[in-house]
């Protein structure tokens, strides 16, 4: 009985963080982050001050991530095109070649978005969560305004509403 109690306690201790509520970083100032883009450019998030920034963390093997990325151009990119908005889909934990291959497949299907690389998962560590899919919305003041992990069909609609609100708050 004691052994069962110890095993149950260990299970709860190890598994509970997986189900912890996301959004814990909401309100936090974004640390200095430089994203290496798939095309070789570097984007410093601090240079995006004044813009609303959406970071979408994903992996080539993650089916929920790919579902979300397939919806991204229509629900997010086209809606905010030409406004003070920046979106980067950050592939984490994978080599450039694998990411480039998957992005080429997606582009053949008409799914086009800016792609950043985080092969050593340093960016997601800086933002405090390594799970995927993950969306982080950074306000014009470079503070995290939305942080959500996991995929639901409604999630991009919710994110779009937050982005719209942040864009409308700007002078």
Label the predicted regions.
Residues 1-4:
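Positively charged n-region of N-terminal signal peptides that target proteins for export
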Residues 86-88, 103-140:
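Short, internal strand/loop/helix patches
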């Amino acid at each position: 009985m004691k052994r069962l109690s110890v095993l149950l306690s260990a299970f709860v201790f190890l598994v509970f963080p997986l189900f912890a509520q996301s959004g814990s970083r909401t309100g936090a100032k974004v640390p200095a982050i430089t994203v290496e883009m798939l095309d070789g450019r570097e984007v410093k998030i601090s240079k995006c001050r004044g813009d609303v920034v959406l970071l979408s963390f994903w992996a080539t093997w993650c089916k929920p991530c790919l579902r979300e990325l397939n919806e991204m151009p229509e629900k997010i990119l086209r809606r905010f095109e030409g406004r003070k908005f920046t979106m980067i889909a950050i592939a984490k934990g994978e080599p450039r070649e694998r990411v480039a291959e998957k992005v080429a497949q997606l582009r053949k299907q008409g799914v086009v978005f800016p792609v950043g690389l985080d092969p050593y998962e340093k960016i997601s560590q800086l933002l405090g969560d390594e799970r995927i899919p993950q969306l982080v919305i950074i306000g014009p003041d470079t503070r995290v305004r939305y942080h959500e992990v996991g995929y639901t069909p409604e999630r991009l609609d919710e994110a779009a509403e937050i982005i719209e609100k942040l864009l409308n708050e700007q002078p």
